[in-house]
Amino acid sequence: MDPVACEDVAVNFTQEEWALLDISQRKLYREVMLETFRNLTSIGKKWKDQNIEYEYQNPRRNFRSLIEGNVNEIKEDSHCGETFTQVPDDRLNFQEKKASPEAKSCDNFVCGEVGIGNSSFNMNIRGDIGHKAYEYQDYAPKPYKCQQPKKAFRYHPSFRTQERNHTGEKPYACKECGKTFISHSGIRRRMVMHSGDGPYKCKFCGKAVHCLRLYLIHERTHTGEKPYECKQCVKSFSYSATHRIHERTHTGEKPYECQQCGKAFHSSSSFQAHKRTHTGGKPYECKQCGKSFSWCHSFQIHERTHTGEKPCECSKCNKAFRSYRSYLRHKRSHTGEKPYQCKECRKAFTYPSSLRRHERTHSAKKPYECKQCGKALSYKFSNTPKNALWRKTL
């Protein structure tokens, strides 16, 4: 198995995210960080008699003490036997910033590599064979510029990964299921999922993931928790990435542009879906029935029709569903929620399909035509024997 890099297992919370964790999640977090601090101790780090949560909430002090500690020729019981040496303070360009950095640490140390900080506040303890053990990167230049959207990167691999978001290139393929990824770390995470060896197992469905952050995110698919709220329309989201994409619907930002037709999109996933309208690609094929799918998620839900798995269960009536989307649709039958509203008459609907059908009454659009009499309607009668006589004309 490939060595685990720090960025693949980093536990990294912002203050806002930390405030959203409940007691059980913080307890799990402390257990993970305890193991991390033990690893730090094994390479010479000294801790005062303070609790773990306090240590993590004060990373700047730990950051400084780590620099000033005696880390002389640390040799890990590792794969390469590299020697780590301490750098004098005068060789460190250390400047404190006002904003507290976040901490990143590695569960599985490979030659003792440890990272503390975020992208703008990052120090690595590296074995450079007798040279720099600490490399401070706060004010390092970012020579790699991405124009779509405008972002700068310090390292070329990060820049290449960002480029693949726009080009759709996914050079790393999983041998188990064929799913492709833009980075090698994606493959490692996928292999953990297939092997079931991840240290964090979901108590609802048994799915294993390799790091705490992904575990907490996955848990929300079962609990329905939505901690990210849009300030403009008060809509809530389970994931920060979904929240950011939604915000672009208000700002009008569309950073992903198709090079073939010039159409732009709010999200990378929408852009990738659009690209397949040009290529016709359906890379996910069911081994049991041969049906192909454009999306891995659709493929996984389809597989459940063969296995009979229904992981999403309604707490009110115990009815189970194959997909979370179907579960949400069913949930509205209990709550009476109607989130889809017509912009013209303000009438609300439970499902988006009902809204689209209603909107045709305003536009006079009638895409269905009777084969026998030629009469046009805005929608077909799906529950009548006459359904077979209607065909879609648009």
From Swiss-Prot:
GO CC terms: nucleus
GO molecular function: DNA-binding transcription factor activity; RNA polymerase II cis-regulatory region sequence-specific DNA binding; zinc ion binding
Zinc finger feature spans (C2H2-type): 144-166, 172-194, 200-222, 228-250, 256-278, 284-306, 312-334, 340-362
Domain of life: Eukaryota
Domain KRAB, residue spans: 4-86
Biological role stated in the UniProt entry: May be involved in transcriptional regulation.
Protein name: Zinc finger protein 763
